[in-house]
Amino acid sequence: MIINKKRVILFVFFALILLIAAVAVWFFQFNPTGYRMSVSCRASFEKISDNVFVNRNYAGNRDDIAALIDEAIARDTDFFGSLVCRDHTVIIICDDEKLLAKLGGDHDTQTVLFPVKKSCISVSTEYLNVDVLAHELTHAELHERLSGKALRRIPTWFDEGIALQNDYREQYSSETWAEQTDNGKHTVAHEDMDTGAEFYSGTKEDRRFRYLNAKHDVSEWLENHGLQDFMNLIDRLNGGEDFRAAYGS
């Protein structure tokens, strides 16, 4: 009986090790978030500066990447006053379609909270411009300033609305908003774009219209409240206050 018990314990022990190993392989090899987190360890990518990586066979000019990132950082620094996210943010530039599929996006930011908070930005050459980089870095900065609990509770329209403040593309301009909403007569209610499932659903035009509304609404809030109130809002959210109560006051 003692021998059988030892065998059972050993079997369970090794089964757990195999299970953990299998989960780790799945996460880092087949899950986009895990794949991004492990880019620094992959032979398919190379580091070109601190926390900036490109696929090894990248056909573009690496100096152009550095210049665009510097411009985006300057834009975001002007907005926030300073950036605290850079040490915990990885930027991945990729022009390989197969690798982009593994990264799970060609112009987006994924933020993980465990074991430490870290944002991984993936951008393809199609979207490699200062507006997209500034947009994604704004996500990373906002996520860095918010606690994990507060980050999970903010609505998607607010997250995107803040990021769009540093995205100057014409498709999200105030003139475009006025034209497409008939000067605000036809807009999207906040409660209809609270979640990612709501915000990113539908056609490209549907999503773009929500982006447009999110930018306009957050722009108006910032004009009425200013940067200091925005920073106070972050503090209040980190303190556990309900988003709608804090944002509406």
Model-derived features with residue positions:
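N-terminal Sec-pathway targeting helices
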Residues: M1-A21
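Membrane-interface motif at the C-terminal end of an N-terminal transmembrane signal
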Residues: L18-S40
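Short, exposed beta-strand/loop patches in secreted or surface proteins that constitute
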Residues: A43-K47, T109-V116, S124
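Acidic/His/Gly-enriched intrinsically disordered linker/tail segments
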Residues: V132, A150-H216, L222-S249
